[in-house]
Each structure stands twice: as C-alpha cells, then as structure tokens.
Regions:
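Enriched but not universal
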Residues: 1-6, 552
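Asp-box/BNR beta-propeller blade signature and adjacent active/binding-site loops
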Residues: 4-383
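Exported/extracytosolic protein signature
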Residues: 383-553
Length: 553
C-alpha cells in the first residue's frame, strides 16, 4: 500500500523508501544537549562528509558551539564516529557549517560563523571590537576531512555598512562549465544598514582569496532573501534559491555570482522560510553520477513543503533547469527542518536533515529511480479537504533554566528585544519557549546550571510547538480556538476563519514538571475546536521521558 502526503497544491507525494537511513546525531547523546544545522558533501575521493553543530543548548550563535563531522567511506552504509573540527571555548563558538569541495585540488572547505558576544542581529559594523563582530571563518582539509586548519575571512568579505555576516549553511559549489569554470562559490547572508541581504563569495584561485559579489535585496514581491543556495546550470549560469514564505525565491547570475537578477517566487516549492538546498542531479563536478545528455538540465531540491510550518521535508526534481518541479518524494511527513541534498557516488541521492523538533540529524540514501520515475508516472492528485485542517508539530526542546543562574567564567546577556524590527520567532532559534533573553554562559556554566547531558527530559525543560488551523471550505468557521496544556493560552485567542483563511500558533509551550517524571511517558494533547465545539480536531504527542523519543498521531 502506498502512502501519500496531501500537499498545499493538492498533489499526492509518494513516500521515499531509503536504501539506508542513519541517525547521525541525537539530542543528549555523545556529549551535546543539542545538534543542529546539517551540511553534506562528497569529497573528491568519494567520501561522504556530514557536518553539523554540537551545541550546549538550543541557542544559535553566540554560544560556545563546536563544529562536528562524521565521514562515510561506503556511500553512507557505515559511518565513522563523530569528530571535532573546531571547539568553542569561553563564550566563543563556531557554527552553521557549509561544505564546499574543490574537485581540482581535493581541498574541502567548511565555511562557518564565529562569534563571542554577538550573533547576526547584534553584530557591529567594521572589525572591532572583535568580540562584538560576527566573523566569517573557514576551516579546510587536504586529507579528505581527517584534519583541519582554520582561517578568518571577515576582512575580505565584510564591506562597509555590513553588520551581521554568515555563510548560508549546507553546501557551496564549484562551477563546472562555462567562462567561470573552476570558480568556488559560497553563499552568504548579511545585514546591511538594517536590511537582510544575500551575496555570493567567490574565489578564482582555489580558495586563497575571496571577494563578495553585489548584494541581493528584496525581489519582485517585496520579499527579501535569507539563507540561500546556488547551483551551476548546464550553460554555466548560476541559479539561486532562498528560503522565504510562502514559497522559495529564485534568481539567476550570468557572471559567476557577481550580480543577480531580481528575486522571483518559485510556486512549485512552498516554504516556511526554512533552510533548504539545491544541487545538480548529476553531481558535477565532485560526483560523476550515472546520467545522459538529457539529465544535464536536471536539478534536485530539498525543503519543507509547507508555507508556514517546519514539517514535511520533500525531495523535488526539476528536468528543466529549475523552471518547474514536477516530481516530488516525501522524505519526512512530520516535524523536520534544515536539509542538504547531494548525489552520491553510487548514484543514489543523499539527504541530511533535522527531524523531530531538532532532536535528530538523519542521513537518508534514496535510489534515484524513486524520484525520476515520477516524471513519467505521476501519482494522482489527492482531493483537498472540505472541512477545517489542523496541523501541530514539535518545534524544539529547551533545557530548563534555573531560577538563579550561576556564573562560571565569562557571562553575557542578549535581551529578547535586541533584534529590533526583526521577529525573534522567525529569524532566530533561542530557548525559553522563544520568549526570554538569551543568556550566554561558558560550557562550564551551562553544565553547572543545566546539569548532566542526557537523552531524556528533566523538570523545567520546555517543549515548544507550532501549529495551524486552515479553512479550505466554503463556509466561515467561528470560535476557532486551540486547547491544550500549554502555559501561554492567552497568546492564542479564539478567532473566525473565513474560507481560505488560516491561523498560526507560534509557539504554544509546555514545561515538564517533576511529577511528569514520575512516569515513563508524557502525553500532550492539543485540540482545535470551532463552531461552539461542533468541530473538534486532535493531535497527540508522546514523549519517552527516559530516551527522549517522540511520537505523534
């Protein structure tokens, strides 16, 4: 029996059946309370490289985050143990990896951000004071990822007026054809005079020097870029995709990333403004996967196929250089977030993605035929529901903060209001149910305040959810209300939904109690009611309090 997902375009998406699936990192296992930000690439020797953050808590930079790597020498069947690439110390951390392979030299680059007191929104212009600058760093390896050296690129890339600056996590590219063949290109996100922009950093000397191309601002719809990826087309042009809502944005460069056309929406790829990926189907230049002249225009994309919620990670195929995306496979039907896709040396498609409220980072190897077969044999369209539709997913888990924070070494606080015009719920992952200040403490302080690192849950841990009720019908729905055990009920008052409208719930949160821990399992039930209770929809979550496992139905 084939299972399908009802997409926002009323298409039925077949479920992917991976040849291999491995959980490479699990919250609370192997020394970290949190893992995030998957990056994936294949080296010139055919080694699969999976990089990600090892975090002392959920918070984005600044935070004493470590850069981690796992390698596979057999197309993802088995994996080496987790290795440290770069270690955060004091308040300084290194995060958001992006992998780029120079197929000519074999050198592997791992771009990342570095920060001590400031992240993207708090950073100052210029290069001083160093602790208040968000730095653009790169680590590189000449022995297939075994050992790494580190460089700082901030002075080369940070033009006047730029404050925040970081490499878009996931994967960079090497241009394989055309007048700029051999050029290395890594996408960046930057804050310029209060506006979020994007740009390409590129190198024509195998990574010795780098320069930043022209800035990419809001496109034809007025929506601007954020984390973005590029791919080289068969004629040497570059295609860019950026996270955005309600769908991804695209642009084209004819000069190797120096300048870009205005951003345009990609209706075939709904998106909740989450970091997805873009890659060549044939894997060039690092991978020479089986293909033909026909497939030279084929592209792969991975993202959350939903205009609002981080859920439903879908793998898509374009046969026409990204003009359309007719073939789609559902990789993860529930809570999932960032993803990176690449072609593997054995011809399969590899995806590294976040699952279950950032609890796991998962690698999946999917036979390419499962996706390519959909170009000629597409599944039938699924009917659009006539009544209300209720979606609720686990967004994140935050370790409970004690009533009184105990310092151990350096200490710094970033107020929750420091992002100014930017909604912290949209642009930044921090703990405390997305409502509190970001407390920066050393690794030692976090161990002292959060306690031992375990895969299960503790009293005070915060479970944050995101949800939505939409009305695809023809009649209004009155008194639409979210019921559940969340402590912030007042944030979600009853509402009326006219046909075609929706209401979002970001983020109903539940704090685990000591009495919860007397049981082995915690169940949380959310109910959406409408029309005076005549309409009821439920979503139940089950948390194994010892192992950390999450299930939803």
């Amino acid at each position: 029996m084939t299972s399908y997902l009802l997409g926002s375009s009323s298409s039925a998406f077949p479920l992917a059946v991976p040849d291999a699936e491995h959980v490479l990192a699990t919250r609370g296992v192997d020394g970290y309370r949190q893992y995030r930000i998957p990056a994936l690439a294949v080296s010139a020797r055919g080694t699969i490289l999976a990089a990600y953050d090892g975090r002392p808590n959920l918070d984005d930079l600044p935070n004493p985050i470590d850069l981690l790597l796992r390698r596979s020498f057999d197309n993802g069947v088995t994996w080496e143990p987790q290795q440290l690439v770069r270690t955060g110390a004091g308040l300084q951390g290194f995060g958001d990896p992006s992998l780029l392979v120079d197929a000519d030299t074999g050198r592997i680059f791992m771009f990342h951000a570095a920060g001590t007191h400031s992240g993207f929104f708090e950073a100052v212009a210029g290069l001083e004071p160093k602790d208040d600058v968000q730095h653009a760093d790169v680590s590189y390896s000449d022995d297939d990822g075994g050992t790494w050296q580190h460089r700082r690129l901030t002075a080369q890339l940070k033009n006047p007026g730029i404050t925040g600056l970081f490499a878009a996590a996931g994967q960079g590219i090497q241009i394989h054809t055309g007048p700029f063949a051999g050029r290395l290109v890594q996408q960046y996100v930057l804050l310029m005079e209060g506006s979020i922009m994007a740009a390409s950093a590129f190198s024509d000397d195998h990574g010795e020097t780098w320069q930043l191309g022209e800035l990419i601002g809001p496109g034809t719809t007025g929506v601007g870029p954020n984390e973005n990826k590029v791919v080289c087309l068969d004629d040497g042009q570059l295609l860019l995709h950026s996270r955005a809502t309600p769908c991804r944005l695209s642009a084209v460069s004819e000069d190797g990333g120096q300048t870009w056309s205005p951003l345009q929406p990609v209706p075939d790829l709904p998106d909740p403004s989450d970091n997805g990926s873009l890659a060549r189907f044939d894997g060039l230049p690092a991978v020479h996967a089986p293909g033909s002249a026909e497939t030279s225009t084929w592209l792969l994309a991975s993202n959350n196929h939903d205009p609002h919620l981080r859920r439903n990670t879908v793998l898509s195929l374009s046969p026409d250089n990204g003009a359309t995306w007719p073939a789609k496979l559902l990789l993860c039907p529930g809570s999932s977030a960032y993803s990176t896709v690449t072609r593997l040396p054995d011809g399969n498609i590899g995806v590294l993605y976040e699952r279950d409220g950032y609890r796991e980072i998962v690698f999946a190897s999917i036979p390419a035929g499962q996706l390519t077969g959909l170009l000629s044999a597409r599944p039938p369209a699924a009917p659009e529901p006539s009544g209300l539709v209720f979606d609720m997913e686990l967004r994140s888990v935050t370790p409970g903060r004690p009533a009184v924070w105990q310092n151990a070494g350096d200490f710094h606080v970033i107020p929750s209001t420091s992002d100014g015009q930017w909604d912290v719920q949209t642009w930044k992952e921090i703990g405390q149910g997305y409502a509190g200040d970001q407390v920066l403490g050393t690794r030692e302080a976090q161990d002292l305040n959060y306690g031992p690192i375990v895969p299960g849950y503790k009293a005070g841990d915060i479970l944050a959810f995101t949800g939505r009720v939409r009305n695809p019908g023809t009649e209004p729905a009155t008194g639409v209300v979210l019921l559940g055990p969340h402590h912030n009920v007042g944030d979600f008052p009853p509402t009326t939904l006219l046909p075609g409208e929706h209401v979002l719930y970001f983020t109903p949160s539940y704090t685990i109690t000591a009495s919860d821990l007397e049981r082995s399992t915690l169940q949380i039930l959310f109910t959406a009611e409408a029309d005076g209770g005549r309409v009821r929809m439920e979503r139940t979550f089950s948390f194994d309090l010892r192992t950390g496992a999450v299930a939803a139905d």
